[in-house]
Amino acid sequence: CIVAWAQNDDFVQYQLDNGLTVYLWEDHDQPDVQGWTVTRAGSIDEPATATGLAHYLEHMLFKGTDRIGALDWEKEQPLYEQIIALYDTLALTTDAKAREAVQLRINEVSLEAAKYAAPDEFSNLIQGIGGEGLNAFTAYDVTCYMNSFPAYQMERWLTLYADRLTNPVFRSFQAELENVFEEYNMYLDDNSTHSRNFIFGKLYEGHAYARDIIGYAEDLKNPKLRKLIDFYNTWYVPNNMALILVGDFDIEATKPLIEKTFGKLQARPLPDRTKYPTTAFAQDERYSAKLGYMPELYIAYNGVPVGDKDELLLDFLGDI
């Protein structure tokens, strides 16, 4: 049922039949276990007309499934499907008054659907097993979800994280957009964000890396629930994901629990990731801009492609 890639007494790397890559590091000097799921999909994989989608999906995967967070799924489901259809209509509507009417209807149906859901249940369940530091982040190439938990709750944690990926329901879609906009506005006031966007715009012109991960305001104002669902169905599959566990647990006792939980996830064919052209910049290119209150100097060098044997070494060198 597994293919082993690397192994020693404390570290094991292997793959389940469904393609999920598993990394286990047994470290009894740690007081608990740190658990991560990583999906090989980030902002570079989202449509250019729906920027911020990968990050928004990260937020929505805390909202539960048809079991977690569902007080009465039979009543919530038709309302949820109606909300999806209304967002499809909104995306095709250009008249301002007509859009306002559709948005009003989305509000009404969302309020009705909220009667049958508890969107914070996943977070509450993690907290209930002693989980701490529940969080996630979206990068250009990956999206990661993580928290720490007591080792004796290993099976429960694995069950919750695997269930999270089984029939997720993106409830409170409209309300969560306010949180994303708060984050967007916070970055607008952050000098380092302006600097990074300027630098990446120069280094990666014509590449998805030049886009800000959180997305453009015009796309955030026109959320596309159907595209978010399609993005999830395309990339969030076990053969495109990894499970990482580090800490005070027994590797051999944990393997059957992983098979029992994450082994149930169904693999699906993956599309090829879009390949963007990259152009190495010429020797000694220089740019300047007035972006903040303090002078800053950034120096960038041509590197190696993602996955190159020297990538990790360059990452370490960059941190020194």
What are these regions (language model features)?
Residues 1-3:
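Bacterial N-terminal signal peptides
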Residues 5-45, 69-152, 186-240, 251, ...:
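Non-catalytic beta-strand/loop surface segments
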Residues 46-48, 155-157, 174, 307-310:
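Solvent-exposed, non-transmembrane alpha-helical starts
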Residues 48, 60-72:
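Metal-associated gating/positioning segment near the N- to mid-region
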Residues 51-63, 315, 319:
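Active-site recognition of the HExxH zinc-binding catalytic motif
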Residues 64-66, 147-177, 320:
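M16/insulysin-pitrilysin zinc metalloprotease superfamily fold
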Residues 159-164, 256-262:
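Short amphipathic alpha-helices in soluble, non-transmembrane regions
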